[in-house]
Structure formats: C-alpha cells, structure tokens
C-alpha cells in the first residue's frame, strides 16, 4: 500500500497548502538549499540542542537531525485536529479524576478494574487526592499519524512528562533565520509564544495557599538526563528557576527552594522527574532526585505539581486501547480522532492472532517509550520474530500489537533532491482553566528510507510544522 504524500500525492498532484511554498522552492538554487541545511546544523550545534542516548559505548550526546523542508497544514485541517485533541484531553483529565475518586468507569465495566489496579503507573497514594484547580494533565503531547487526506489517528497520549517542545521552538527560530523571505510570503501561525503560554497556564493552576504572583520552578533530574537541554531551555524562556531535588526542602508545610537569601516558597513545580523518584518518603527510598515529604505537601494542597503524580496510567498503551470508550463515557460523544486498531496480548484470542501474524504487525511494550522494546514485523528477520514471540508468550500482558500502517510522508532534502519520508506529529496541549493547543507542534520524521520509526533515539529527525493562517 502506497503512503499518502502530504505535499504531492500520486492521484491528485500538488496539494493546496503547499502551493505557495512550491512556487518559492522552484526558484531556489539546489546549492543554496544544501548550504542552508549545513547552516541549520551549525546553528543547532552552537545552541547545544542535543539529547542523550542510553546503552551506547560511544558518545552519549547526539544532535537531532533537522530537515529544512517544512510540513504544512491548512487552517481547516488544523481546526479539525484541535477539536479532536481538545475532546481527548478533556476525557483524559476526567478519566484520571474518576479512577482516583469515584471509579465510575470501572464500576460500569467500560475499563477492566484489574487493568487499572494492577498497573504500575496507577498510584494508590493518589486515591482521594484532588490536585489544585482539579487539573491532572497540565502539559500533554498527543502523537498523531496520518493515513490519507482525511484520516488522522492518535498513536499515543503522552500524559506524564512529554518532551520535544524545545525542538519545536528552535526549529521555528532557525527556519525564520534561514528563510525570512518565506515567512513574509506565507502566513504561518506563530509558536514562539509557547513559553509565555506555559508560564501563564501554570500560574493559573496555583494552589490556594499561593500569596500574590505564584513562584514557579522547573524540577530536573540533572544534567545527565536525556532531556536536560529542554529543562534548562524552558526554565530560561519562562524566566523561572531550574532546580534539582537537592535544592528543595519542606519548610513549614510548603516546598521551598534554597536561595542566597534563604529558602523561598515554591507554589508550582513543573517536574521532569518520574513519579517513582519524586519523593523518597513515599516512593523509591533510594531516590536522590526528588524532595522528601513533597507528597505530604501536595496532599495538603500547598503545591501544584505538573503533571500530577499518577498521570502515567492515562498514557499506558493498554489503557490506550480503551480510549474510544473513555472518550464516549466522559464526553457523551464518539471520539473525533480515532485510535489505531489494537490487539491486547493479555487476551488469549488476541495473543493467538498476534503470534500467527507477528511478521505483519507492530508490537509494543505496554510501558515502553522512545521506540525501545518494540518489533516492527515487516522489517524484522525471521529470527527476531521468533525471539519476540517467546517474550510475548512469557508475559503477554506486557504487550499490545497494531497493524503496520502506511504513515503519510513529507519530502526531505537529500543529496539527490526531495525524497519522501514517513512522519508523525506531536502537538503540545496546555491545560489550566482552559485548553490551549500550540498551532503545529513537533513533526518527527523517519530519515531512513522506508523506515516507520520516527523516534530521535532510533535515528529519527524533526521538521518545522506550519499551520497556515487561512
């Protein structure tokens, strides 16, 4: 099955969102574009935009490849996507509030109780705890794939600590530096105000104990974390402190950070530390990344933690398979954005089907991320399929399977000119007293020809994403 090309489909020819860009592109000298690609790489190296790769003996720091051909969406396409994203985010927040309180969806049998109760991402410590302003998922990254002109599907809900937004911002800034004339010719909706929107959104969910303008900080695990650049970047762009666990302590029932003038109360903590490491008195006792006693402060309502502890259950891949039911249960309407069909390997009939068709399917770990721990059947060897089948049979509940979809393609610039590569899209959503969706998001691209894996940890790159102001 041929993939749908978002710029130049085989059937209909050049699509309207790309018309103005295509006219400009045809006027360009190929040598100039090649030079601009090299300029972009120099910009990223100078800025220090890297990510860490674990499990490799070589240097752990990598530059994420950037392609200068933008992905372009019309305003109409974006409006439809935002409607579906907003509906889904509302349902996710309602689901989290429900499972940590009344558990109506479990009592109704729409989601199996054991799937929640036995899930390692479900935190019993959060039962009965309502976060300030009732918001659990303050920042969400919804991964979306496209199959055809009008078919978009949600691939994954990143409701814990979604990353990549710094690349979205730097991609746009770099494109505007390299091609200022393009942004004069084509009206593209801005993304550069994201840090200000993020700060405003976090301030809007401050706890009632906050006095005056809330003090906000970004909690990072430290410089060895793969996304440390982003943590520092966002703190700097928002004009707030970047802190580590060792900088914080509980003082008089509040979390406070160490300053030259003593300890200062923190009202909102945008944490990029996983749940298990957040509080050694509540979770992992060996954690040096969190703050001893912070969960007591949180339960007392004296700090906002974004995202709330326990939100990981909402982006669990087994829970994902129930998202159509979850959306309908809490919104009363069918999901605007559908799911990719999913086989739950914990179910005997599904496991049987998956084992029989393993070479045709994409199989993922329920708690996996970053493209690790997955099998792309059509790209795997017979031996790899056999070895993965043993894992499935040993722990079927650890896996889900999905059909291998022909993800849409967008052109990238290669030595031989433009060439199509598969892409996905991660729009970023901010939730406070309202839902705000950044126009565009991060387009991830599988740079290897024929590959469907877009994750940067697996060799993927990124593109600037344009939403036309039409």
Tell me the role of every PLM-derived stretch.
Residues 1-470:
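Preference for protein termini
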């Amino acid at each position: 099955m041929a993939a749908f090309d978002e710029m130049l489909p085989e059937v209909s020819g050049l699509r309207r969102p790309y018309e103005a860009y295509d006219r400009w592109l045809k006027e360009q000298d190929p040598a100039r574009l090649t030079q601009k690609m090299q300029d972009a790489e120099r910009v990223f190296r100078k800025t220090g935009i890297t990510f860490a790769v674990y499990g490799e003996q070589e240097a752990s720091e990598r530059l994420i490849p950037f392609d200068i051909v933008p992905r372009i969406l019309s305003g109409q396409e974006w409006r439809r996507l935002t409607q579906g994203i907003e509906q889904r985010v509302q349902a996710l927040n309602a689901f989290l509030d429900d499972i940590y309180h009344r558990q109506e969806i479990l009592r109704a049998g729409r989601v199996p109780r054991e799937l929640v109760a036995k899930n390692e991402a479900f935190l019993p410590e959060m039962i009965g705890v309502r976060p300030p302003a009732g918001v659990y998922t303050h920042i969400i990254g919804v991964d979306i794939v496209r199959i055809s002109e009008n078919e978009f599907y949600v691939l994954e809900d990143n409701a814990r600590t979604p990353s990549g937004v710094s690349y979205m911002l730097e991609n746009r800034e770099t494109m505007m530096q390299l091609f200022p004339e393009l942004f004069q010719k084509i009206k593209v909706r801005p993304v550069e105000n994201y840090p200000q929107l993020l700060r405003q959104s976090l301030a809007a969910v401050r706890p009632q104990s906050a006095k005056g303008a809330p003090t906000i900080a970004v909690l990072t695990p430290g410089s060895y974390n793969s996304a440390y650049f982003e943590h520092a970047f966002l703190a700097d762009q928002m004009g707030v402190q970047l802190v580590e666990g060792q900088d914080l302590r509980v003082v008089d029932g509040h979390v406070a950070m160490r300053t030259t003038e003593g300890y200062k109360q923190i009202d909102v903590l945008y944490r990029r530390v996983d749940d298990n490491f957040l509080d050694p008195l509540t979770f992992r006792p060996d954690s040096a990344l969190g703050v001893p006693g912070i969960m007591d402060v949180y339960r007392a309502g004296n700090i906002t933690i974004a995202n709330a502890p326990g939100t990981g259950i909402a982006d669990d891949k087994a829970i994902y398979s129930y998202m159509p039911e979850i959306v309908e249960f809490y919104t009363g309407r069918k999901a605007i954005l559908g799911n990719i069909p999913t086989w739950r390997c914990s179910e005997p009939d599904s496991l049987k089907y998956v084992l029989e068709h393993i070479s045709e399917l994409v199989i993922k770990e329920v708690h996996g991320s970053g493209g690790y721990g997955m099998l792309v059947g059509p790209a795997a060897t017979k031996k790899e399929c056999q070895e993965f089948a043993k894992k499935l049979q040993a722990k079927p509940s650890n896996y889900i399977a999905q059909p291998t979809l022909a993800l849409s393609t967008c052109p990238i610039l290669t030595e031989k000119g433009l060439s199509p590569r598969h892409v996905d899209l991660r729009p970023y959503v901010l939730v406070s007293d309202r839902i705000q969706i950044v126009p565009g998001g991060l387009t991830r691209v599988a740079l290897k020809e024929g590959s469907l894996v877009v994750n940067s940890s697996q060799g993927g790159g990124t593109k600037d994403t344009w939403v036309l102001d039409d």
